[in-house]
Design a protein with these regions (language model features):
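Nucleic-acid endo/exonuclease domains
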Residues: 1-119
Length: 119
């Protein structure tokens, strides 16, 4: 899948910061109803590679139906999967940072650290 502008910006911020991270991170037990693994855009790790937090960039298709992304049916599926991810993180005490597309212009290392509660 092609990365969005927001995802590219986040990747650049993580690379420049020197943080350990992986893209398209998934957990074996977290799947969509059809069995497809649900992936998080980024997983950020400490120096021992213990998970610190996950980042999800939420493009417009997470909030609005768009024919470009499959219309209302795709929107409902996207929102359902987003809720599965939120529940999973809550149940496993994993910090999930969701960045809406409306905040794309605010993206910076400080923005991410603030959202993680470290500023």
């Amino acid at each position: 899948m092609r990365a969005s502008r927001g995802e590219i910006t986040i990747e650049e911020i993580l690379q420049e910061s020197g943080l350990n991270f992986k893209e398209e991170y998934s957990f074996p037990e977290l799947t969509a109803p059809n069995g497809t693994p649900l992936r998080f855009d980024f997983a950020v790790f400490d120096d021992d590679w213990d998970l610190m937090f996950l980042i999800e960039y939420q493009g417009r298709q997470h909030y609005e139906a768009s024919s470009k992304f499959g219309g209302k049916k795709a929107l409902y599926r996207q929102q359902y999967n987003d809720n599965l991810k939120r529940r999973y993180c809550g149940l496993h005490n994993i910090l999930l940072i969701e960045i809406p597309y409306t905040d794309e212009h605010l993206l910076s290392f400080d923005y991410i650290m603030h959202r993680a509660g470290w500023c």
